Amino acid sequence: MTNIRKTPPLLKIVNHSLIDLPAPSNISAWWNFGSLLGLCLMIQILTGLFLAMHYTSDTATAFSSVTHICRDVNYGWLIRYLHANGASMFFICLYMHVGRGIYYGSYTYLETWNIGIILLFAVMATAFMGYVLPWGQMSFWGATVITNLLSAIPYIGTTLVEWIWGGFSVDKATLTRFFAFHFILPFIIAALVMIHLLFLHETGSNNPSGIPSDSDKIPFHPYYTIKDLLGFLVLILLLMLLVLFSPDLLGDPDNYTPANPLNTPPHIKPEWYFLFAYAILRSIPNKLGGVLALVMSILILAIIPFLHMSKQRSMMFRPISQVLFWILVADLLTLTWIGGQPVEHPFITIGQVASILYFSIILILMPLASLIENKILKW
């Protein structure tokens, strides 16, 4: 008798994706982040759904509705902090996942990589709009500053900003539409994830060596199902530690003050996961230039596959590229730190140097290192 999982069309899809999927035998813990991102997305959709049951997207009541969730709703505080810190875990996993892709040359799967970049943009947009919803000081001013960047677009800028706002400033219309978009986008993200996986399963997974592993495959279940479950446990443990011990560690105290258009906070800054891009934006004195640098800081990922000069796919056997990769990681951490600092003397210069270094490593130094490594191989 044919196994039940191999005949019904739906179970067949599940079987080919999660059970009988041939996977490389040597993929490390860096390959866990894909499934962890799936878990994060599910946590966010579920907690978000329950928050939306009690939230009101109106400037007069938004802030107090969040307070009501935390004080009066059964386990409302838990749902709210799971959602807020779940976003942080989401971005930690995202950056690790992208970093893995760069280190091991996974970007050579062009379709998967490009869908991944679209996913990254979609998640960033969702997180930004979600941050506006509690309608605290940082929500309001963050929305004002970031949407205002679009006014740098020549000719149509101002019109575009007012169109997004639904008026002449960030107000009720803006909050309502941001809530609508924040609700719908995660489901679009879920659909994109399916396409991401569809393209990945066309080629199969990469592995740390970067060498085709067709001759050495193992079934996904039980080997990688149990490995993913271990990853889930670690992620949930870290998330619960954050939520139950210091839920406001990564948040901004200013967001506990209701939004006031007449009072600007001393330091307007986004959530920690956007600080590196914010630092790049601020390091350029020109508005349009800053916006272009901001967009390019993420869009540069799309150029990486075309800058791959090495004869090897992975960085596993490329020491010069490895050093550059870890300098890039340190540079991103530096930018994250600078993004949270005031615009004052040493920080401005550090930010500018770090921004130049960021683009230089990706566009110039890494391709050069690859060419040098190719020469060393010949020699």
Swiss-Prot record:
Entry membrane topology? Multi-pass membrane protein
What subcellular locations does the record give? Mitochondrion inner membrane
* A Pfam family of this chain: Cytochrome_B
Look up keyword Mitochondrion and say if it applies. Answer: yes
Query: What does this protein's UniProt record list under function?
Result: Component of the ubiquinol-cytochrome c reductase complex (complex III or cytochrome b-c1 complex) that is part of the mitochondrial respiratory chain. The b-c1 complex mediates electron transfer from ubiquinol to cytochrome c. Contributes to the generation of a proton gradient across the mitochondrial membrane that is then used for ATP synthesis.
Record keywords? Electron transport, Heme, Iron, Membrane, Metal-binding, Mitochondrion, Mitochondrion inner membrane, Respiratory chain, Transmembrane, Transmembrane helix, Transport, Ubiquinone
Q: Coding gene?
A: MT-CYB
Q: How does it assemble?
A: The cytochrome bc1 complex contains 11 subunits: 3 respiratory subunits (MT-CYB, CYC1 and UQCRFS1), 2 core proteins (UQCRC1 and UQCRC2) and 6 low-molecular weight proteins (UQCRH/QCR6, UQCRB/QCR7, UQCRQ/QCR8, UQCR10/QCR9, UQCR11/QCR10 and a cleavage product of UQCRFS1). This cytochrome bc1 complex then forms a dimer.
Q: Which GO terms describe its molecular function?
A: metal ion binding; ubiquinol-cytochrome-c reductase activity
Q: What is the lineage of its organism?
A: Eukaryota, Metazoa, Chordata, Craniata, Vertebrata
- Please list the cofactors this protein needs: heme b
Q: Which residues cross the membrane?
A: 33-53, 77-98, 113-133, 178-198, 226-246, 288-308, 320-340, 347-367
Family, similarity comment: Belongs to the cytochrome b family.
Biological processes annotated in GO: mitochondrial electron transport, ubiquinol to cytochrome c
Provide the binding site for heme b b566.
H97, H196
Q: What is this protein called?
A: Cytochrome b
Q: What else is known?
A: Heme 1 (or BL or b562) is low-potential and absorbs at about 562 nm, and heme 2 (or BH or b566) is high-potential and absorbs at about 566 nm.
Superkingdom in the source lineage: Eukaryota
